[in-house]
């Protein structure tokens, strides 16, 4: 009980950090005419240095907002174990190294966004320009939910006690290594879901929140493994729905065109 009380400041600090990041995202989206917000949505395939820095900062803030909540149980468990060993700075090292992994992912995301926008696969709002790309990303993320790698990484993320029993290292450097390892497991668990940001839009706060809830649910709720599979099924069904709409729409347009041609020929005759 004493440990729980001692962890209240840590919980408050983490939640305040998450809230701050969400408020920054909300500001960027609602005040899109602000010069900084405009830098995060490059209108040209040729980015300026300001665009590069702003987009990277946006991704870092978004990753903290999305991924830190699901890491809270692991951070609290490490804090509890570190306090028993009288090592007060280890928890900071663990958390920072975990976030470094998502900073690294943000670098990759910026490179991917720049490359995709340059080739016309993404628009300035970071949305896929064709439904085919969205379908591919949804199917890929849906199938990945059923893979062994996903299950292994999810299991490591869901069991803080088991993780530290298997990988515990003492000292600040040891905590840094454990945080990095946990971050890599988390990245292995969630990278495919993160790519879905390009389906609903990086600047779509509702979509970002939906993906965050999905990540938190599968990593922290008691039925997380089942939730993970249901997410996979839902993503595949969403891809099928979009694919059906795309095929049906094209078929209707084709039939409409044929009908127009027939009517024109009848009028001429």
Task: Indicate residue ranges for each PLM-predicted region.
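Histidine-/acidic- and/or cysteine-rich, low-complexity loops and terminal segments associated
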Residues: 1-60, 117, 121-126, 148-169, ...
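Residue-level signature of transmembrane alpha-helical entry/exit and packing/kink sites
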Residues: 10-14, 47, 51-55, 90, ...
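A small-residue-rich subset of transmembrane alpha-helices
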Residues: 87-115, 189-223, 230-235
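Transmembrane alpha-helix/helix-exit interface in multi-pass inner-membrane proteins
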Residues: 103-121, 131-159
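Hydrophobic alpha-helical transmembrane segments in multi-pass integral membrane proteins
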Residues: 106-113, 185, 240-254
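Alpha-helical transmembrane segments of helical membrane proteins, especially in multi-pass transport
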Residues: 142-152, 174, 178-202
